Amino acid sequence: MAVVKCKPTSPGRRHVVKVVNPELHKGKPFAPLLEKNSKSGGRNNNGRITTRHIGGGHKQAYRIVDFKRNKDGIPAVVERLEYDPNRSANIALVLYKDGERRYILAPKGLKAGDQIQSGVDAAIKPGNTLPMRNIPVGSTVHNVEMKPGKGGQLARSAGTYVQIVARDGAYVTLRLRSGEMRKVEADCRATLGEVGNAEHMLRVLGKAGAARWRGVRPTVRGTAMNPVDHPHGGGEGRNFGKHPVTPWGVQTKGKKTRSNKRTDKFIVRRRSK
């Protein structure tokens, strides 16, 4: 895998930095594991914008990724690594011994021909999935479940990982990349190693059009709008003279948004600022 800076053959290419991985499959994805992925344009079922700056972009098919990794005791061979337009991480197509194929998140160091396995008897090596009560303390894991059997929810983006720092009876304590320390049930599964494609963070799109290809629309400052469009709009100068708010009048800097008291007891230490 290499980080390549493009030659300035045009203004749009001058600042482009891309990640090149010659090991990625160059053909079409595995058709039985594809689903239609309709674009919402950031609108809900009432047609109202619920998420701004979304719209357009290239058509994409959704790859059905196995986040549960629940085929216990059946070894699988990695057939190939693939690009996935729906996430920052790459995915791997694996063939199980019983003939079934599934997509999984590609951990760092995984390559075609490698063997992986799930279950309590799986070896402690990157790509294998086990309940966290069977994983040594201090190990680095990804695709971590928060409820047994629900499928991985933590550490799924490119280059991310979680560290198991303690095990106490029915719970393990995890250190997340944000600095948060959190308890989850020891029967929750996790995949050993960290997610691959860590160089994803080094890429530079180089021009606004590349963001539009990805379905990202422009972000306009509230102070540049009219009063009818935003609480910061209007006025003769640039100062809006009030506390920063969203277009709907909600405080936007420092206001707490978390309201899940039910799971507060599982957070040992809050994330670092």
Swiss-Prot record:
Chain positions with N6-acetyllysine modification: K242
Highest taxon listed in the record's lineage: Bacteria
GO molecular function, one term: structural constituent of ribosome
InterPro entries found in the cross-reference section: NA-bd_OB-fold, Rib_uL2_dom2, Ribosomal_uL2, Ribosomal_uL2_bac/org-type, Ribosomal_uL2_C, Ribosomal_uL2_CS, Ribosomal_uL2_dom3, Ribosomal_uL2_RNA-bd_dom
Annotated region (Disordered), positions in chain: 28-53, 221-273
Listed Pfam families: Ribosomal_L2 (PF00181), Ribosomal_L2_C (PF03947)
Ranges of compositional bias, category Low complexity: 39-48
GO biological processes: cytoplasmic translation; negative regulation of DNA-templated DNA replication initiation; ribosomal large subunit assembly
Keywords: Acetylation, Ribonucleoprotein, Ribosomal protein, RNA-binding, rRNA-binding
GO cellular component terms given for this protein: cytoplasm; cytosol; cytosolic large ribosomal subunit; DnaA-L2 complex
Function: One of the primary rRNA binding proteins. Located near the base of the L1 stalk, it is probably also mobile. Required for association of the 30S and 50S subunits to form the 70S ribosome, for tRNA binding and peptide bond formation. It has been suggested to have peptidyltransferase activity; this is highly controversial.
Family according to the record: Belongs to the universal ribosomal protein uL2 family.
Anything else known: This protein can be partially replaced in vivo by its H.marismortui (HmaL2) or human (L8, from the 60S cytoplasmic ribosome) homolog.
Quaternary data: Part of the 50S ribosomal subunit. Forms a bridge to the 30S subunit in the 70S ribosome, contacting the 16S rRNA. Interacts weakly with S6 in one of the 3.5 A resolved structures. In pull-down experiments interacts with CedA.
Protein name per the record: Large ribosomal subunit protein uL2
